């Protein structure tokens, strides 16, 4: 089964984001108070963000024996399950916001962080210790993979470095 491209991702999102879900009033207002148009826009903007080729969505760099290097982005590893997880996170964020006294309804402000969190959870996906596996993943089965380097910079600014007190060491 091929990985979904952006159009297929929009189709998958439409299975999980429907007009029967509560939508944030700001998002509704931005789309003429039309739930169908709001859902369409949320799906389009979310898929565009998910499939963006930016520095923060770079995942790995594969070096081939004869043809040079290729950059893979998180989008290259997208799946229906990943999209389902993004929507589940989005719903969780919306419910938590509402329970904390915020406005009810799913918003683009819930979807975008859900993408980042899903990508962050999948940071350990690539096994960079065995470059030969990447020939299969990259679709260049006849190419010899000589190196795989992680390029993960996603959410780097939000990673917390903590000072911990000394303790016992084994």
Set out the residue ranges of the language-model regions.
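Short, surface-exposed linear patches
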Residues: 1, 21-23, 128, 134-135
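Conserved C-terminal "switch" segment of AAA+ ATPases
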Residues: 2-82, 92-101
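C-terminal engagement/docking regions of AAA+ P-loop ATPases
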Residues: 65-170
């Amino acid at each position: 089964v091929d990985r979904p491209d952006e159009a297929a991702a929009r189709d998958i999102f439409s299975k999980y984001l429907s007009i029967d879900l509560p939508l944030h009033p700001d998002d509704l207002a931005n789309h003429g108070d039309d739930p169908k148009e709001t859902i369409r826009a949320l799906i389009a903007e979310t898929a565009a963000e998910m499939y963006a080729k930016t520095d923060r969505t770079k995942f790995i760099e594969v070096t081939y024996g004869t043809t040079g290097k290729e950059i893979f982005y998180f989008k290259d590893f997208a799946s229906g399950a990943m999209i389902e997880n993004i929507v589940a996170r989005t719903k969780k964020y919306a419910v938590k916001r509402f329970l904390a006294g915020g406005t009810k309804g799913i918003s683009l402000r819930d979807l975008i962080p859900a993408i980042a969190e899903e990508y962050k959870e999948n940071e350990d996906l690539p096994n960079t210790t065995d470059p030969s596996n990447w020939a299969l993943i990259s679709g260049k089965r006849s190419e010899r993979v000589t190196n795989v380097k992680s390029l993960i910079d996603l959410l780097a600014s939000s990673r917390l470095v903590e000072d911990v007190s000394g303790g016992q060491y084994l």
